[in-house]
Amino acid sequence: MAIQRTFSIIKPDATKRNLTGQIAAKFEEAGLRIVASKRIQLTLAQAQAFYGVHSERPFFGELCEFMISEPIVVQVLEGEDAIVKNREVMGATNPADAAPGTIRKEFALSIGENSVHGSDAPETAAEEIAFFFSGLELVG
């Protein structure tokens, strides 16, 4: 198994409820290292650019408004099979379908306010990391 990096967002519903530390602990307990992290307030333009792949979907506007409603925490996670491991720790997109002990099962409010985002493939991880971090900010 190879050491990988993946991208994670702790979303507004979770930061608003002060869950950042508990969510970060779940990543670390799963063997993922946080090699970059920052709390930011997205602008509408940034949210629209980041989620541009969804621009034609009916939920795009609502998603962007949600993502600018409160600060978010963007992170780069590193570890063996980090992308798969992160997705396992997050749980299913719909918290009703998420396994016990996962972030979404424990903390998500709904399918829309599901507390976290994680990259789904090496290519998207690289793009998403580069959107928020310079190489100098990645320490590990």
From Swiss-Prot:
Cell location: Cytoplasm
TM spans (from-to): none
Coiled-coil features, chain-numbered ranges: none
One of the protein's GO biological processes: UTP biosynthetic process
Binding site for ATP: 11, 59, 87, 93, 104, 114
Substrates-to-products reaction catalysed: a 2'-deoxyribonucleoside 5'-diphosphate + ATP = a 2'-deoxyribonucleoside 5'-triphosphate + ADP; a ribonucleoside 5'-diphosphate + ATP = a ribonucleoside 5'-triphosphate + ADP
Enzyme Commission number(s) from the entry: 2.7.4.6
Record-linked PROSITE patterns: NDPK (PS00469), NDPK_LIKE (PS51374)
Main localization category: cytoplasm
UniProt keyword annotations, A-Z: ATP-binding, Cytoplasm, Kinase, Magnesium, Metal-binding, Nucleotide metabolism, Nucleotide-binding, Phosphoprotein, Transferase
Cofactor(s), by name: Mg(2+)
Domain of life: Bacteria
Free-text function comment from the UniProt entry: Major role in the synthesis of nucleoside triphosphates other than ATP. The ATP gamma phosphate is transferred to the NDP beta phosphate via a ping-pong mechanism, using a phosphorylated active-site intermediate.
The protein's assembly and partners: Homotetramer.
Protein's name in the database: Nucleoside diphosphate kinase
Source species: Jannaschia sp. (strain CCS1)
Taxonomic lineage: Bacteria, Pseudomonadati, Pseudomonadota, Alphaproteobacteria, Rhodobacterales
This protein's encoding gene: ndk
